Amino acid sequence: MREKSWFREYGLILAAGVAVGIAALILTASGNPKNMGFCIACFLRDIAGALGLHSAANVQYIRPEIIGIVVGAAAAALAAREFRAKAGASPACRFVLGMFVMIGALVFLGCPLRMVIRLGGGDLTAVAGLVGFIAGILVGVVCLKKGFSLGRAYPVRMGEGFVLSGILMALLGLLLLVPTLLKFSEAGPGSMRAFWGISLAAGLVVGVLAQRSRLCMAGGIRDAVMLRDFKLLSGFLAIWGTVTIGNLVLGSYSLSALSQPIAHSQYLWSALGMALAGWGSILLGGCPLRQWILAGEGNGDSAVTVLGMIVGAAVSHNFGLAGAADSVAEDGTYVVGGIGTAGMAAVAIGFAVLLAITVTHLPKTEAVSRD
């Protein structure tokens, strides 16, 4: 009886984690960059580039994985009668938070999901990101305990919940039918891509399972700290375990802090970037993956958030905020990447903005006592 209860509680979330890990491995084997089989931040950066929102030629492509995630989540929510069109909870603040979550993630060179995938590939530089991510979540937990809230969303017309899905389906149509309207990378990460059908299918599977299991990278650590509930965290660990085992079997596991794919060794700024992403994710109620799932379920506030993320990706590359990967020069010299002064300033500004949003969304009694 106890075994059945355990399976009922953890079975779906573990299956979702394993599926995400397998999807990441398949996508990498099919052409996506190494240690980047699935990365919400990287995919949004590429989509922003494909739409001409930034001019970084190496990161431009409409990633079907994102389209699949949202459509899969919408289909799962409709089938389970959980689709709810709602909006109206601090949309402007959510847009800004989405921007800075993305800026922080691109300083690190990956979203929380890619952080786990990088760890599963043996990338020791991602440990700094994990430490920062946990620290940011802990700050967010303190904010929640103080009463932080972006407010309540209210029901809206059903059609509102399908707007984002419709936009993404239109992008898929452009990709397949009128690709000349879009920009495509001829070199760099944007040029490394799986066949669109494989990418779309992987996104659909992940979207369905993530919707049903409530999979969330930030939520797992938040619930473990606040509620001593390790259910969501088990999904986080399942992704890491699956990717690690898969890489070992495939011979692509490389335990090192040097020459890792699309990664840099400025550990402090990796940690700070992910701290910004972690804190912002808690204030938003979920990591970037979770925001896309919620948007697929009809949540207009999450739709605004992910649009903010796309703008954040564009801003990161237009103003040189994103991290640059370590590389090896022609003469064999190891060149450390990382971020420049603009990126450092953006992270500092991001922390200030998150603090301001936190203070202005505390209960009045808490805000008064703080003053």
Residue ranges and their predicted role:
Residues M1-D371:
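Membrane-interfacial helix-loop segments of redox and metal-homeostasis proteins
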